[in-house]
UniProtKB/Swiss-Prot annotation:
Superkingdom classification of source: Eukaryota
Transmembrane segments annotated in the record for this chain: 31-48
GO molecular function, one term: transferase activity
Signal peptide positions on this chain: none
GO biological process, one term: glycosylation
Site, Cleavage: residue positions: A45, A46
Cellular component GO terms, alphabetical: cytosol; lysosomal membrane; lysosome
Cytoplasmic-facing ranges: 1-30
Protein name: Bis(monoacylglycero)phosphate synthase CLN5
Reaction catalysed by this enzyme: S-hexadecanoyl-L-cysteinyl-[protein] + H2O = L-cysteinyl-[protein] + hexadecanoate + H(+)
Its job: Exhibits palmitoyl protein thioesterase (S-depalmitoylation) activity in vitro and most likely plays a role in protein S-depalmitoylation.
Residue spans of biased composition, Gly residues class: 1-21
Length: 361
C-alpha cells in the first residue's frame, strides 16, 4: 500500500485552482452522491482481535510524513501560496477569528452551504503589524481520494492517496468567508501564546498525516457507542482552539456548529492490515470482497456508469448492510445499521480557558 505525502512544514500554503490532471476522485459527483445516499438510507427503514477493542479506536500518529507517490495527483493544487508561520512579538495582541464557508464554495457558491456542508479554518490578525493570516487543514488530493482507494490493475491491494495537512498563508479572503459563511472574532491572545501555538501546529501537522471522513458510531443517539472518530478540517480547528485554551485563551460565548458525516453500525470487526489481508498468505476471499466493495467508488467515465455504481453502493450498504473501513492503515468490517449514513451540522461549544494566568496581554 502506498500512501501519498509531501506536506511537511515547508510545504504549507494556500489552496488554489491550479491543476495537475491525474486520478483525482471527482468531487462534483461524489458530493451529491453522499447526499443522495444519506437521503436514501434515511428513507430505508464478530468477533475481532480482543486487544483491538478500545472504542473509539485511537487515531494513529506517525514520526514523519512520507514523500508523495507520483501516482497521486490533485485537481486543485494544495497550498500554492503558503508561507511559514511568522514569529510574533510576545507583547503583540493577536485577534483569533472563526472562519467557515461552504465546501467547494469557489466552484459551487452557496450550494453546499444550504445543506450545511461546511469547511472550517482559523484567522489571525496582528495588532502591531496589522497583517492577517489564515490557517486551515485539508486534503492533499481532494476528498474522494481520502475516502476511497484506487484499484490499480498492477497491484493486488487497494492503493490509497490519503493525506491531510496544515496550510498557512498571509491574508484573509473576507469575501470568501463572509459572503456565504462566517468570519467572527472568537478570542484575543498574546504574541507569545501565538508562538507556542505555532510550535504545536508544526508537531501536530508532522504526526497527524491522514484524513478521515467518517465518524462511526452505533446509533444517532448522543450517548451511543462511538467506534471511530473523523479527522478533518473541523477537528483541526477544534484541536487548535483547545490548545489555545490550554495556553490561556479566553473564548467568547458564541454558538459554533460543525459538519459531520456519520456511519452507523454494530460493533466493527478487525480484519487486518494490507499484508495480512492482501499479502501472499492473506485471505483471498476477504481481499476480493474488499475490492468488490470499493469498485463502485472508482472514477467514472459516463453518467450511466456513475448511476449504476450508486445502485451497487446502495445494495452493499443498505440492502446487505456492509461497509469496509480503512482506518489507521488497517481494514475493518462495519455491520451497517439504519439510518446507515447521516450528515449533521452540530454545535460544539468553544472551550473554556484552562490557564487563568494569561501572560503577555
Amino acid at each position: 500500500m502506498a500512501q501519498a505525502g509531501g506536506a511537511g512544514a515547508g510545504a504549507w500554503g494556500r489552496r488554489g485552482a491550479g491543476a495537475g490532471a491525474g486520478p483525482e476522485r471527482a468531487p462534483w459527483r461524489w458530493a451529491p452522491a453522499l447526499l443522495w445516499l444519506a437521503a436514501a438510507t434515511a428513507a430505508a427503514a464478530a468477533a475481532g482481535d480482543p486487544s483491538r477493542r478500545q472504542w473509539p479506536v485511537p487515531y494513529k500518529r506517525f514520526s514523519f510524513r512520507p514523500e508523495p507517490d507520483p501516482y497521486c495527483q490533485a485537481k486543485y493544487t494544495f497550498c500554492p501560496t503558503g508561507s511559514p508561520i511568522p514569529v510574533m512579538k510576545d507583547d503583540d495582541v493577536i485577534e483569533v477569528f472563526r472562519l467557515q464557508a461552504p465546501v467547494w464554495e469557489f466552484k459551487y457558491g452557496d450550494l453546499l452551504g444550504h445543506l450545511k456542508i461546511m469547511h472550517d479554518a482559523i484567522g489571525f490578525r496582528s495588532t502591531l503589524t496589522e497583517k492577517n493570516y489564515t490557517m486551515e487543514w485539508y486534503e492533499l488530493f481532494q476528498l474522494g481520494n481520502c475516502t476511497f482507494p484506487h484499484l490499480r490493475p498492477e497491484m493486488n491491494a487497494p492503493f490509497w492517496c490519503n493525506q491531510g495537512a496544515a496550510c498557512f498563508f498571509e491574508g484573509i479572503d473576507d469575501n470568501h468567508w463572509k459572503e456565504n459563511g462566517t468570519l467572527v472574532l472568537v478570542a484575543t491572545i498574546s504574541g507569545g501564546m501565538f508562538n507556542k501555538m505555532a510550535k504545536w501546529v508544526k508537531q501536530d501537522n508532522e504526526t497527524g498525516i491522514y484524513y478521515e471522513t467518517w465518524t462511526v458510531q452505533a446509533s444517532p443517539k448522543k450517548e451511543a457507542e462511538k467506534w471511530f472518530e473523523s479527522y478533518d478540517c473541523s477537528k483541526f480547528v477544534l484541536r487548535t482552539y483547545e490548545k489555545l485554551a490550554e495556553l490561556g485563551a479566553d473564548f467568547k460565548k458564541i454558538e459554533t456548529n460543525y459538519t459531520r458525516i456519520f456511519l452507523y453500525s454494530g460493533e466493527p470487526t478487525y480484519l487486518g492490515n494490507e499484508t495480512s489481508v492482501f499479502g501472499p498468505t492473506g485471505n483471498k476471499t476477504l481481499a476480493l470482497a474488499i475490492k468488490k466493495f470499493y469498485y463502485p467508488f472508482k472514477p467514472h467515465l459516463s453518467t450511466k456508469e456513475f448511476l449504476l455504481s450508486l445502485l451497487q453502493i446502495f445494495d452493499a450498504v443498505v440492502i446487505h448492510r456492509e461497509f469496509y473501513l480503512f482506518y489507521n492503515f488497517e481494514y475493518w468490517f462495519l455491520p451497517m445499521k439504519s439510518p446507515f449514513i447521516k450528515i449533521t451540522y452540530e454545535e460544539i461549544p468553544l472551550p473554556n480557558r484552562k490557564n487563568r494566568t494569561l501572560s503577555g496581554l
